[in-house]
Amino acid sequence: MIEETQTPSPPAPAPAPAEYPIDLLTVESLDIEAQGIAHRADGKVVFIEGALPFEQVTANVYRKKSSFEKATLTAIYRESSQRVTPACPHFGMHTGACGGCKMQHLHIGAQVAVKQRVLEDNLRFIGKVKADNLLRPIEGPAWHYRYRARLSVRYVRKKGTALVGFHERKSAYVADMTECHVVPQHVSDMLVPLRGLISSMDARETIPQIELACGDDLTAMVLRHMEPLSVADLARLRAFAAANAGLQWWVQSGGLDTVKLLDAQVAELSYGLPEFGITMPFKPTDFTQVNPHINQVLVSRALRLLGVQPTERVIDWFCGLGNFTLPLATRAREVLGIEGSEVLVARSRENYERNKASSHVRPALEATKFVARNLFEMTPAMLVKDGAAEKWLVDPPREGAFELFKSLAALHQQVVTGVPCDDGIHQQSLALGGWTPPSRIVYVSCNPATLARDAGVLVEGGGYRCTAAGVVNMFPHTAHVESMAVFERL
Protein backbone atom coordinates (compact mmCIF):
# COMPACT_ATOMS: atom_id res chain seq x y z
CA MET A 1 0.00 0.00 0.00
CA ILE A 2 1.30 3.46 -0.86
CA GLU A 3 1.42 5.82 2.09
CA GLU A 4 1.95 9.53 2.33
CA THR A 5 5.53 9.84 3.49
CA GLN A 6 8.23 12.45 3.57
CA THR A 7 11.74 11.12 3.81
CA PRO A 8 13.57 13.08 6.52
CA SER A 9 17.14 14.15 6.14
CA PRO A 10 19.36 11.36 7.45
CA PRO A 11 20.30 11.99 11.08
CA ALA A 12 23.82 12.90 12.04
CA PRO A 13 25.90 9.74 12.50
CA ALA A 14 25.68 8.47 16.06
CA PRO A 15 28.87 7.80 17.96
CA ALA A 16 30.15 4.31 17.18
CA PRO A 17 29.14 1.93 19.99
CA ALA A 18 31.91 0.46 22.04
CA GLU A 19 32.77 -3.01 20.78
CA TYR A 20 34.74 -5.79 22.36
CA PRO A 21 35.70 -9.21 20.97
CA ILE A 22 34.45 -12.50 22.31
CA ASP A 23 36.06 -15.91 22.15
CA LEU A 24 35.20 -18.76 19.81
CA LEU A 25 31.49 -19.62 19.84
CA THR A 26 29.48 -22.40 18.19
CA VAL A 27 26.30 -21.18 16.51
CA GLU A 28 23.29 -23.36 17.34
CA SER A 29 20.43 -21.93 15.27
CA LEU A 30 19.01 -18.85 13.56
CA ASP A 31 16.38 -16.46 14.86
CA ILE A 32 13.65 -14.94 12.70
CA GLU A 33 15.94 -12.03 11.81
CA ALA A 34 18.54 -14.49 10.45
CA GLN A 35 20.95 -13.85 13.31
CA GLY A 36 23.01 -16.76 14.56
CA ILE A 37 22.21 -17.82 18.12
CA ALA A 38 25.04 -18.96 20.37
CA HIS A 39 25.62 -19.26 24.11
CA ARG A 40 28.55 -18.19 26.21
CA ALA A 41 30.00 -20.59 28.78
CA ASP A 42 27.86 -18.91 31.46
CA GLY A 43 24.71 -19.52 29.38
CA LYS A 44 24.23 -15.97 28.16
CA VAL A 45 22.69 -15.74 24.67
CA VAL A 46 24.64 -14.03 21.90
CA PHE A 47 22.95 -13.01 18.63
CA ILE A 48 25.55 -12.85 15.86
CA GLU A 49 24.77 -11.10 12.58
CA GLY A 50 26.01 -13.05 9.56
CA ALA A 51 26.70 -16.32 11.40
CA LEU A 52 25.01 -19.60 10.43
CA PRO A 53 24.10 -22.74 12.41
CA PHE A 54 26.97 -25.12 13.29
CA GLU A 55 29.63 -22.56 12.45
CA GLN A 56 32.43 -21.79 14.88
CA VAL A 57 32.99 -18.05 14.88
CA THR A 58 34.40 -15.06 16.67
CA ALA A 59 32.48 -11.80 16.91
CA ASN A 60 32.50 -8.27 18.27
CA VAL A 61 29.77 -7.40 20.75
CA TYR A 62 28.15 -4.03 20.03
CA ARG A 63 25.17 -4.22 22.42
CA LYS A 64 25.22 -5.72 25.88
CA LYS A 65 22.10 -6.42 27.94
CA SER A 66 21.61 -8.35 31.13
CA SER A 67 20.15 -11.41 29.38
CA PHE A 68 21.71 -11.26 25.91
CA GLU A 69 24.32 -9.65 23.70
CA LYS A 70 24.31 -8.62 20.04
CA ALA A 71 27.43 -9.03 17.97
CA THR A 72 28.81 -8.81 14.45
CA LEU A 73 30.73 -11.66 12.87
CA THR A 74 34.50 -11.15 12.63
CA ALA A 75 35.85 -14.56 11.57
CA ILE A 76 34.63 -18.06 10.69
CA TYR A 77 36.76 -20.98 11.88
CA ARG A 78 34.37 -23.73 10.80
CA GLU A 79 32.02 -22.87 7.94
CA SER A 80 28.49 -24.19 7.46
CA SER A 81 27.84 -26.40 4.44
CA GLN A 82 24.74 -24.24 3.89
CA ARG A 83 26.74 -21.02 3.44
CA VAL A 84 26.66 -19.74 -0.16
CA THR A 85 28.11 -16.76 -1.99
CA PRO A 86 25.48 -13.98 -2.16
CA ALA A 87 24.35 -13.22 -5.70
CA CYS A 88 24.07 -9.48 -5.10
CA PRO A 89 27.16 -7.30 -4.61
CA HIS A 90 25.15 -4.97 -2.36
CA PHE A 91 24.31 -7.69 0.18
CA GLY A 92 26.36 -8.00 3.34
CA MET A 93 26.71 -7.25 7.04
CA HIS A 94 28.98 -4.25 6.52
CA THR A 95 28.09 -0.58 6.92
CA GLY A 96 26.35 0.66 3.78
CA ALA A 97 25.09 -2.78 2.72
CA CYS A 98 21.56 -2.97 1.33
CA GLY A 99 18.98 -3.93 3.94
CA GLY A 100 16.47 -5.43 1.51
CA CYS A 101 17.63 -9.03 2.06
CA LYS A 102 18.78 -10.86 5.18
CA MET A 103 19.57 -14.41 4.01
CA GLN A 104 21.40 -14.35 0.69
CA HIS A 105 24.37 -16.05 2.38
CA LEU A 106 22.18 -19.06 3.30
CA HIS A 107 21.18 -21.80 0.84
CA ILE A 108 17.57 -21.34 -0.28
CA GLY A 109 16.53 -24.77 1.05
CA ALA A 110 17.94 -23.92 4.46
CA GLN A 111 16.09 -20.59 4.39
CA VAL A 112 12.81 -22.47 3.97
CA ALA A 113 13.73 -24.85 6.80
CA VAL A 114 14.36 -21.87 9.10
CA LYS A 115 10.94 -20.43 8.26
CA GLN A 116 9.27 -23.81 8.81
CA ARG A 117 10.85 -23.99 12.27
CA VAL A 118 9.67 -20.44 13.04
CA LEU A 119 6.12 -21.43 12.11
CA GLU A 120 6.20 -24.60 14.21
CA ASP A 121 7.71 -22.78 17.19
CA ASN A 122 5.05 -20.06 17.01
CA LEU A 123 2.25 -22.61 16.88
CA ARG A 124 3.75 -24.54 19.80
CA PHE A 125 4.69 -21.70 22.13
CA ILE A 126 2.08 -19.04 21.30
CA GLY A 127 -0.95 -21.07 20.27
CA LYS A 128 -0.18 -24.30 22.18
CA VAL A 129 -1.04 -26.07 18.94
CA LYS A 130 0.66 -28.83 16.97
CA ALA A 131 -0.43 -29.47 13.40
CA ASP A 132 -1.27 -33.09 12.57
CA ASN A 133 0.69 -32.81 9.33
CA LEU A 134 3.29 -30.51 7.78
CA LEU A 135 2.50 -29.23 4.30
CA ARG A 136 5.20 -29.33 1.67
CA PRO A 137 6.63 -25.79 1.43
CA ILE A 138 5.43 -23.71 -1.50
CA GLU A 139 8.50 -22.50 -3.37
CA GLY A 140 9.14 -20.62 -6.60
CA PRO A 141 11.88 -18.60 -8.29
CA ALA A 142 14.56 -17.49 -5.84
CA TRP A 143 15.45 -14.37 -7.83
CA HIS A 144 13.62 -11.53 -9.60
CA TYR A 145 10.34 -12.47 -7.94
CA ARG A 146 9.42 -9.18 -6.26
CA TYR A 147 6.75 -7.47 -8.37
CA ARG A 148 5.95 -4.90 -5.70
CA ALA A 149 8.44 -2.75 -3.82
CA ARG A 150 8.89 0.69 -2.33
CA LEU A 151 12.11 2.22 -3.61
CA SER A 152 13.44 5.05 -1.49
CA VAL A 153 14.93 8.06 -3.28
CA ARG A 154 17.45 10.61 -2.06
CA TYR A 155 19.41 13.21 -3.97
CA VAL A 156 22.90 13.62 -2.48
CA ARG A 157 24.20 17.10 -3.19
CA LYS A 158 27.80 16.32 -2.31
CA LYS A 159 27.87 13.51 -4.84
CA GLY A 160 25.68 15.29 -7.36
CA THR A 161 23.60 12.18 -7.89
CA ALA A 162 20.41 10.49 -6.73
CA LEU A 163 20.23 7.17 -4.92
CA VAL A 164 17.30 4.85 -5.71
CA GLY A 165 16.75 1.58 -3.85
CA PHE A 166 16.22 0.05 -0.43
CA HIS A 167 17.55 1.44 2.83
CA GLU A 168 20.92 0.43 4.17
CA ARG A 169 20.92 -2.15 6.96
CA LYS A 170 19.75 -0.61 10.24
CA SER A 171 19.88 2.88 8.74
CA ALA A 172 17.71 5.67 7.37
CA TYR A 173 20.17 6.17 4.52
CA VAL A 174 19.37 4.90 1.01
CA ALA A 175 21.77 2.19 -0.18
CA ASP A 176 24.02 3.04 -3.12
CA MET A 177 22.58 0.40 -5.47
CA THR A 178 23.23 -0.20 -9.16
CA GLU A 179 21.36 -3.51 -9.41
CA CYS A 180 18.89 -5.65 -7.48
CA HIS A 181 18.42 -9.41 -7.74
CA VAL A 182 14.95 -9.65 -6.18
CA VAL A 183 13.01 -7.17 -8.33
CA PRO A 184 12.26 -8.17 -11.96
CA GLN A 185 15.31 -8.03 -14.20
CA HIS A 186 13.93 -5.17 -16.29
CA VAL A 187 13.43 -3.12 -13.12
CA SER A 188 16.96 -3.89 -11.95
CA ASP A 189 18.21 -2.72 -15.34
CA MET A 190 16.37 0.58 -14.80
CA LEU A 191 17.97 1.45 -11.44
CA VAL A 192 20.96 3.31 -12.87
CA PRO A 193 18.86 5.12 -15.51
CA LEU A 194 16.37 6.04 -12.76
CA ARG A 195 19.17 7.60 -10.76
CA GLY A 196 20.10 9.65 -13.79
CA LEU A 197 16.48 10.65 -14.38
CA ILE A 198 15.95 11.84 -10.79
CA SER A 199 19.29 13.68 -10.80
CA SER A 200 18.21 15.60 -13.91
CA MET A 201 14.84 16.71 -12.51
CA ASP A 202 14.06 20.15 -11.10
CA ALA A 203 12.25 18.45 -8.18
CA ARG A 204 15.12 16.04 -7.46
CA GLU A 205 15.48 17.11 -3.81
CA THR A 206 11.78 16.66 -2.99
CA ILE A 207 11.14 13.16 -4.37
CA PRO A 208 11.21 10.68 -1.44
CA GLN A 209 10.10 7.43 -3.04
CA ILE A 210 9.00 5.48 -6.09
CA GLU A 211 6.41 2.74 -5.57
CA LEU A 212 6.83 -0.22 -7.92
CA ALA A 213 3.90 -2.39 -9.05
CA CYS A 214 4.36 -4.89 -11.88
CA GLY A 215 1.60 -6.74 -13.69
CA ASP A 216 1.94 -9.57 -16.17
CA ASP A 217 2.57 -7.17 -19.06
CA LEU A 218 2.99 -3.67 -17.60
CA THR A 219 5.12 -1.97 -14.96
CA ALA A 220 3.78 0.98 -12.96
CA MET A 221 5.98 3.39 -11.05
CA VAL A 222 4.32 5.85 -8.68
CA LEU A 223 6.50 8.93 -8.21
CA ARG A 224 5.92 10.64 -4.85
CA HIS A 225 6.72 14.34 -5.20
CA MET A 226 6.56 16.96 -2.46
CA GLU A 227 6.38 19.97 -4.78
CA PRO A 228 4.60 20.45 -8.13
CA LEU A 229 6.44 18.94 -11.08
CA SER A 230 7.64 21.39 -13.69
CA VAL A 231 6.74 21.11 -17.37
CA ALA A 232 10.34 20.05 -17.98
CA ASP A 233 10.11 17.32 -15.33
CA LEU A 234 6.90 15.96 -16.84
CA ALA A 235 8.63 15.84 -20.21
CA ARG A 236 11.56 13.95 -18.66
CA LEU A 237 9.19 11.36 -17.17
CA ARG A 238 7.44 10.87 -20.51
CA ALA A 239 10.75 10.48 -22.33
CA PHE A 240 11.88 7.87 -19.77
CA ALA A 241 8.64 5.90 -20.24
CA ALA A 242 9.01 6.06 -24.02
CA ALA A 243 12.51 4.58 -23.70
CA ASN A 244 11.31 1.71 -21.47
CA ALA A 245 8.56 -0.35 -23.10
CA GLY A 246 5.61 -1.24 -20.88
CA LEU A 247 6.32 1.42 -18.24
CA GLN A 248 3.53 3.58 -16.84
CA TRP A 249 4.22 6.64 -14.72
CA TRP A 250 1.80 7.50 -11.94
CA VAL A 251 2.28 10.60 -9.81
CA GLN A 252 1.37 11.27 -6.18
CA SER A 253 1.44 14.79 -4.78
CA GLY A 254 -0.19 14.03 -1.41
CA GLY A 255 -2.31 11.26 0.08
CA LEU A 256 -3.62 8.17 -1.66
CA ASP A 257 -6.43 10.16 -3.22
CA THR A 258 -3.88 12.15 -5.25
CA VAL A 259 -2.39 9.12 -7.06
CA LYS A 260 -3.13 9.38 -10.77
CA LEU A 261 -1.81 8.27 -14.13
CA LEU A 262 0.55 10.77 -15.69
CA ASP A 263 -1.12 10.21 -19.07
CA ALA A 264 -4.40 8.43 -19.80
CA GLN A 265 -3.84 4.97 -21.30
CA VAL A 266 -6.00 2.10 -22.45
CA ALA A 267 -3.60 -0.54 -21.12
CA GLU A 268 -3.97 -1.46 -17.43
CA LEU A 269 -2.12 -3.48 -14.86
CA SER A 270 -3.37 -7.02 -14.36
CA TYR A 271 -2.26 -10.47 -13.29
CA GLY A 272 -3.69 -13.81 -14.26
CA LEU A 273 -4.86 -16.94 -12.48
CA PRO A 274 -4.89 -19.15 -15.58
CA GLU A 275 -5.95 -22.34 -13.80
CA PHE A 276 -9.30 -20.67 -13.10
CA GLY A 277 -9.62 -18.55 -16.23
CA ILE A 278 -9.40 -15.39 -14.12
CA THR A 279 -7.73 -12.07 -14.97
CA MET A 280 -7.37 -9.59 -12.12
CA PRO A 281 -6.99 -5.92 -13.12
CA PHE A 282 -5.49 -3.77 -10.36
CA LYS A 283 -4.15 -0.31 -9.64
CA PRO A 284 -0.78 0.36 -8.03
CA THR A 285 -2.67 1.52 -4.91
CA ASP A 286 -4.44 -1.86 -4.56
CA PHE A 287 -3.02 -4.62 -2.40
CA THR A 288 -1.70 -7.53 -4.45
CA GLN A 289 0.74 -10.28 -3.55
CA VAL A 290 4.40 -9.41 -4.04
CA ASN A 291 5.25 -12.70 -5.75
CA PRO A 292 2.87 -13.61 -8.62
CA HIS A 293 4.51 -17.00 -9.24
CA ILE A 294 3.90 -18.08 -5.65
CA ASN A 295 0.43 -16.51 -5.64
CA GLN A 296 -0.78 -18.82 -8.42
CA VAL A 297 0.39 -21.89 -6.48
CA LEU A 298 -0.97 -20.50 -3.21
CA VAL A 299 -4.47 -19.98 -4.62
CA SER A 300 -4.45 -23.42 -6.21
CA ARG A 301 -3.35 -25.14 -3.00
CA ALA A 302 -5.79 -23.20 -0.81
CA LEU A 303 -8.72 -24.31 -2.95
CA ARG A 304 -7.47 -27.88 -3.03
CA LEU A 305 -7.09 -27.96 0.76
CA LEU A 306 -10.50 -26.38 1.22
CA GLY A 307 -12.04 -29.11 -0.94
CA VAL A 308 -14.93 -26.94 -2.13
CA GLN A 309 -17.89 -28.85 -3.57
CA PRO A 310 -20.39 -27.51 -6.15
CA THR A 311 -23.19 -27.61 -3.55
CA GLU A 312 -21.37 -25.58 -0.90
CA ARG A 313 -21.42 -21.96 0.22
CA VAL A 314 -18.04 -20.39 1.02
CA ILE A 315 -17.09 -17.17 2.82
CA ASP A 316 -13.83 -15.45 1.89
CA TRP A 317 -12.85 -13.26 4.84
CA PHE A 318 -10.51 -10.32 4.13
CA CYS A 319 -11.17 -10.89 0.43
CA GLY A 320 -9.30 -7.86 -0.94
CA LEU A 321 -9.58 -7.64 -4.73
CA GLY A 322 -11.04 -11.14 -4.92
CA ASN A 323 -7.75 -13.03 -5.31
CA PHE A 324 -9.34 -16.10 -3.69
CA THR A 325 -13.00 -15.14 -4.08
CA LEU A 326 -13.22 -15.39 -7.85
CA PRO A 327 -11.38 -18.73 -8.11
CA LEU A 328 -13.62 -20.04 -5.30
CA ALA A 329 -16.64 -18.98 -7.34
CA THR A 330 -15.62 -21.36 -10.11
CA ARG A 331 -15.95 -24.26 -7.65
CA ALA A 332 -18.71 -23.39 -5.16
CA ARG A 333 -22.47 -22.90 -5.28
CA GLU A 334 -22.17 -19.44 -3.72
CA VAL A 335 -19.34 -17.25 -2.43
CA LEU A 336 -19.48 -14.24 -0.11
CA GLY A 337 -16.41 -11.99 -0.08
CA ILE A 338 -16.05 -9.78 3.00
CA GLU A 339 -13.49 -6.98 3.28
CA GLY A 340 -12.99 -4.08 5.68
CA SER A 341 -12.28 -1.49 3.01
CA GLU A 342 -15.11 -0.01 0.94
CA VAL A 343 -12.55 0.88 -1.72
CA LEU A 344 -11.36 -2.71 -2.02
CA VAL A 345 -14.93 -4.00 -2.09
CA ALA A 346 -15.68 -1.66 -4.99
CA ARG A 347 -12.55 -2.89 -6.78
CA SER A 348 -13.47 -6.54 -6.14
CA ARG A 349 -16.94 -5.93 -7.58
CA GLU A 350 -15.34 -4.42 -10.69
CA ASN A 351 -13.14 -7.48 -11.11
CA TYR A 352 -16.15 -9.72 -10.58
CA GLU A 353 -18.11 -7.95 -13.33
CA ARG A 354 -15.14 -8.07 -15.71
CA ASN A 355 -14.65 -11.80 -15.23
CA LYS A 356 -18.36 -12.60 -15.23
CA ALA A 357 -18.46 -11.31 -18.80
CA SER A 358 -16.05 -14.09 -19.86
CA SER A 359 -18.14 -16.97 -21.15
CA HIS A 360 -15.88 -19.73 -19.78
CA VAL A 361 -16.32 -18.62 -16.15
CA ARG A 362 -19.65 -16.81 -16.18
CA PRO A 363 -21.96 -19.62 -14.94
CA ALA A 364 -19.88 -20.20 -11.82
CA LEU A 365 -19.62 -16.51 -10.91
CA GLU A 366 -23.32 -15.65 -10.89
CA ALA A 367 -23.74 -16.23 -7.14
CA THR A 368 -20.78 -14.15 -5.92
CA LYS A 369 -21.37 -11.21 -3.58
CA PHE A 370 -19.13 -8.73 -1.77
CA VAL A 371 -19.77 -6.70 1.37
CA ALA A 372 -17.70 -4.26 3.45
CA ARG A 373 -17.43 -4.77 7.20
CA ASN A 374 -14.97 -3.94 9.95
CA LEU A 375 -13.51 -7.38 10.53
CA PHE A 376 -11.62 -6.23 13.62
CA GLU A 377 -14.92 -5.56 15.40
CA MET A 378 -16.71 -8.81 14.62
CA THR A 379 -19.31 -10.16 17.07
CA PRO A 380 -21.15 -13.49 17.24
CA ALA A 381 -24.35 -11.75 16.15
CA MET A 382 -22.67 -10.36 13.04
CA LEU A 383 -21.29 -13.80 12.27
CA VAL A 384 -24.74 -15.37 12.41
CA LYS A 385 -26.14 -12.56 10.26
CA ASP A 386 -23.68 -13.39 7.47
CA GLY A 387 -25.18 -16.86 7.27
CA ALA A 388 -23.82 -20.36 7.44
CA ALA A 389 -21.10 -21.55 5.09
CA GLU A 390 -19.60 -25.00 4.80
CA LYS A 391 -16.10 -23.64 4.18
CA TRP A 392 -14.13 -20.51 5.12
CA LEU A 393 -11.07 -18.98 3.48
CA VAL A 394 -9.35 -16.48 5.80
CA ASP A 395 -6.51 -14.26 4.54
CA PRO A 396 -6.02 -11.43 7.06
CA PRO A 397 -3.34 -8.73 7.27
CA ARG A 398 -0.55 -9.00 9.83
CA GLU A 399 -2.96 -8.23 12.68
CA GLY A 400 -4.66 -11.58 12.14
CA ALA A 401 -8.32 -12.54 12.61
CA PHE A 402 -8.66 -12.66 16.40
CA GLU A 403 -12.13 -11.07 16.70
CA LEU A 404 -13.48 -13.28 13.93
CA PHE A 405 -12.29 -16.48 15.58
CA LYS A 406 -13.21 -15.29 19.07
CA SER A 407 -16.78 -14.84 17.80
CA LEU A 408 -16.73 -18.28 16.21
CA ALA A 409 -15.49 -19.81 19.46
CA ALA A 410 -18.21 -18.01 21.44
CA LEU A 411 -20.89 -19.49 19.19
CA HIS A 412 -19.32 -22.92 19.61
CA GLN A 413 -19.44 -22.54 23.39
CA GLN A 414 -23.11 -21.53 23.25
CA VAL A 415 -23.94 -24.65 21.26
CA VAL A 416 -21.86 -26.98 23.44
CA THR A 417 -22.30 -25.49 26.93
CA GLY A 418 -25.27 -23.17 26.66
CA VAL A 419 -23.15 -20.22 27.83
CA PRO A 420 -24.62 -17.02 26.27
CA CYS A 421 -22.57 -15.20 23.67
CA ASP A 422 -21.25 -11.70 24.09
CA ASP A 423 -22.74 -9.82 21.15
CA GLY A 424 -20.54 -6.79 21.75
CA ILE A 425 -23.11 -5.01 23.95
CA HIS A 426 -24.29 -7.59 26.46
CA GLN A 427 -24.47 -11.32 26.87
CA GLN A 428 -27.35 -13.06 25.21
CA SER A 429 -28.23 -16.42 23.78
CA LEU A 430 -28.33 -15.87 20.05
CA ALA A 431 -31.04 -17.46 17.95
CA LEU A 432 -28.87 -19.46 15.56
CA GLY A 433 -31.66 -20.54 13.26
CA GLY A 434 -30.00 -22.65 10.59
CA TRP A 435 -26.54 -21.27 11.28
CA THR A 436 -23.77 -23.83 11.68
CA PRO A 437 -20.01 -23.36 11.93
CA PRO A 438 -17.85 -24.17 8.90
CA SER A 439 -16.59 -27.73 8.67
CA ARG A 440 -13.20 -26.59 7.35
CA ILE A 441 -11.15 -23.39 7.45
CA VAL A 442 -8.06 -22.59 5.41
CA TYR A 443 -6.06 -19.73 6.92
CA VAL A 444 -3.44 -17.89 4.85
CA SER A 445 -1.12 -15.81 7.03
CA CYS A 446 1.61 -13.22 6.62
CA ASN A 447 2.46 -13.27 10.34
CA PRO A 448 3.15 -16.60 12.09
CA ALA A 449 2.66 -15.05 15.54
CA THR A 450 -0.93 -13.96 14.91
CA LEU A 451 -1.67 -17.19 13.04
CA ALA A 452 -0.52 -19.10 16.13
CA ARG A 453 -2.60 -16.91 18.45
CA ASP A 454 -5.70 -17.39 16.30
CA ALA A 455 -5.04 -21.12 15.97
CA GLY A 456 -5.05 -21.32 19.76
CA VAL A 457 -8.50 -19.73 19.86
CA LEU A 458 -9.88 -22.21 17.32
CA VAL A 459 -8.34 -25.29 18.90
CA GLU A 460 -8.77 -24.40 22.58
CA GLY A 461 -12.31 -23.05 22.49
CA GLY A 462 -13.68 -23.25 18.97
CA GLY A 463 -14.09 -26.97 18.44
CA TYR A 464 -11.40 -27.38 15.76
CA ARG A 465 -8.13 -29.20 15.31
CA CYS A 466 -5.22 -28.08 13.15
CA THR A 467 -4.84 -30.82 10.55
CA ALA A 468 -2.01 -29.26 8.54
CA ALA A 469 0.30 -26.25 8.38
CA GLY A 470 3.23 -25.17 6.25
CA VAL A 471 5.26 -22.26 4.96
CA VAL A 472 4.97 -20.33 1.72
CA ASN A 473 8.30 -18.86 0.60
CA MET A 474 6.74 -15.69 -0.76
CA PHE A 475 9.83 -13.58 0.04
CA PRO A 476 13.07 -15.53 -0.60
CA HIS A 477 16.21 -14.17 1.10
CA THR A 478 14.17 -12.17 3.63
CA ALA A 479 13.04 -13.04 7.14
CA HIS A 480 9.36 -12.68 6.20
CA VAL A 481 7.34 -15.84 6.90
CA GLU A 482 4.17 -16.48 4.90
CA SER A 483 2.25 -19.60 5.87
CA MET A 484 -1.04 -21.45 5.71
CA ALA A 485 -2.95 -23.77 8.02
CA VAL A 486 -6.00 -26.03 7.77
CA PHE A 487 -8.55 -26.45 10.56
CA GLU A 488 -11.19 -29.21 10.68
CA ARG A 489 -14.23 -29.15 12.91
CA LEU A 490 -14.25 -31.94 15.48
Curated annotation (Swiss-Prot):
Positions contributing to S-adenosyl-L-methionine binding: Q289, F318, N323, E339, N374, D395
Record's catalysed reaction(s): uridine(1939) in 23S rRNA + S-adenosyl-L-methionine = 5-methyluridine(1939) in 23S rRNA + S-adenosyl-L-homocysteine + H(+)
Record SUPFAM superfamilies: Nucleic acid-binding proteins (SSF50249), S-adenosyl-L-methionine-dependent methyltransferases (SSF53335)
Domain TRAM stretches: 14-75
GO biological process: rRNA base methylation
Ligand binding ([4Fe-4S] cluster): C88, C98, C101, C180
InterPro entries: 23S_rRNA_MeTrfase_RlmD, MeTrfase_TrmA_CS, NA-bd_OB-fold, SAM-dependent_MTases_sf, U5_MeTrfase_fam
Family the entry assigns: Belongs to the class I-like SAM-binding methyltransferase superfamily. RNA M5U methyltransferase family. RlmD subfamily.
PANTHER family in the cross-refs: 23S RRNA (URACIL(1939)-C(5))-METHYLTRANSFERASE RLMD, RNA M5U METHYLTRANSFERASE
Name assigned to this protein: 23S rRNA (uracil(1939)-C(5))-methyltransferase RlmD
Native species: Polaromonas naphthalenivorans (strain CJ2)
